[in-house]
Amino acid sequence: MSDQTPQFGQTPSEAEPDAVALEAGRKLFAGECTFFHGTQRLDQLPPPMGVEIAFAGRSNVGKSTLVNALTGRKTLARASSQPGRTKQLNFFNLADQLVLVDMPGYGYAQAAKDVKEDWQGLMFSYLRGRPNLRRVMLLVDARVEFKASDIAVMELLDKAAVTFQLVVTKADAVKPTPLQRRVADVYAAARAHPAAHPHVFVTSSDTGSGIAELRAALAGLTD
């Protein structure tokens, strides 16, 4: 990446999909999307049924909210203001073309230790062993610097050779100059991890910024 980090609402050339790609993303995510499975146990995972995209991140980073924004549905994935509430893998079938996986949040210190270890163990085991997992979208809050748990997850994904892509959420909550610094830090993290995709998405589920581009990129993974 060059020294010029994209401002909020701007993206480098690889993230500027053409009209065909944008329309493909719009059509895919306008299709029927239904919840079909939730589990806290590896032995109860659904059989692989096509390309899976997992959404991971710290508790309360906005995973469920982003899934809802992508699909244009307010209540498809249950979002909670209470960090650590989502404790299972939730699977959504998008138009029989893509499976979206809303993962439990990690790094919430106030969760009971045994419960925290149980759901983080499930998450890590899923990431390492799911054969049809095409990409992990690793969400980071625009307002919060990287935590040790974020670094640990990126290192685990490197070790497991699971491709992940960083997505900045809640970008509308940060003023342009600090947002630019934050995005620069996230790009630096992407460069430092071999399993990371080089492009970072900067999004706001509230304003919709970056959502169309992310839809287009995810639709491209179904090819």
From Swiss-Prot:
List the PANTHER family hit by this protein, alphabetically.
Answer: ENGB-TYPE G DOMAIN-CONTAINING PROTEIN, MSS1/TRME-RELATED GTP-BINDING PROTEIN
Residue sites binding Mg(2+) per the record: 64, 86
GO MF terms listed in the record are:
GTP binding; metal ion binding
Tell me the classification of the organism that encodes this protein: Bacteria, Pseudomonadati, Pseudomonadota, Alphaproteobacteria, Acetobacterales
Q: Which residues form the signal peptide?
A: none
Domain of life, per UniProt, equals Bacteria
All copies of the EngB-type G domain together span 49-223
Query: What are the cysteine partners in each disulfide bond?
Result: none
| Cellular component GO terms held in the UniProt record | cytosol
Q: Does the keyword Cell cycle apply?
A: yes
Mind telling me which InterPro entries this protein's record contains?
Answer: G_ENGB_dom, GTP-bd, GTP-bd_ribosome_bio_YsxC, P-loop_NTPase
Q: What is this protein for, i.e. what is its function?
A: Necessary for normal cell division and for the maintenance of normal septation.
The alphabetical list of record keywords is: Cell cycle, Cell division, GTP-binding, Magnesium, Metal-binding, Nucleotide-binding, Septation
Which cofactor(s) does the record list?
Mg(2+)
Give one Pfam family, short name only.
MMR_HSR1
Gene Ontology annotations of biological process type? division septum assembly
For binding GTP, which residues are annotated in this chain's numbering?
Answer: 57-64, 84-88, 102-105, 169-172, 203-205
The family this protein is said to belong to: Belongs to the TRAFAC class TrmE-Era-EngA-EngB-Septin-like GTPase superfamily. EngB GTPase family.
Q: Which gene encodes it?
A: engB
Q: Which NCBIfam families match?
A: GTPase_YsxC
State the protein's name: Probable GTP-binding protein EngB
